[in-house]
Amino acid sequence: MLPALRRGARAARRRRTADTPPTRRLATPSFQLGRLNHVALAVPDLAAATKTWAALGATVSPPQAMPAHGVTACFVGEQLELLEPLGAESPIAAFLARHPAGGLHHVCHEVSDVAAAARDLERRGFRVLAPPSIGAHGVPVVFLHPKATHGTLLELQEASGG
């Protein structure tokens, strides 16, 4: 192989490795990943999105501003969350800059103890984006970097009984 091609191939392997979920210490976690809680969609216009879902026959909750997360959220039924940015610094604003029409933002699963799960995941090489904080349902949540979960932003939410 030509030297330039070998260098390119090595660089490509390094990039793939950097974007690959952690493989070291993938021992059994100290927690159980629970049920799917919700799927979240980023939307550029929450009012328009809620009208669409209502026209489809869905029950839509009133919008709820969540300044700590930089979003306004509402729920469609029990398992679909619509997210609109609360200002230019919102992570949803950054998402919409890359995906102007909106789309799938994250998937949320329940765990019994978010703080313990976050500590365990960090210890085993997963990248937790921020310390646990209170989410839309009034319980602790934490997000894992999408590079650690095959390209999907994963939210872990403390189960209500947990």
Residue ranges and their predicted role:
Residues 88-92, 161-162:
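A short local loop/turn or secondary-structure capping micro-motif enriched for an aromatic residue
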Residues 4, 13-14, 19-32, 43-62, 68, 72-84, 86-87, 99-147, ...:
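Vicinal oxygen chelate
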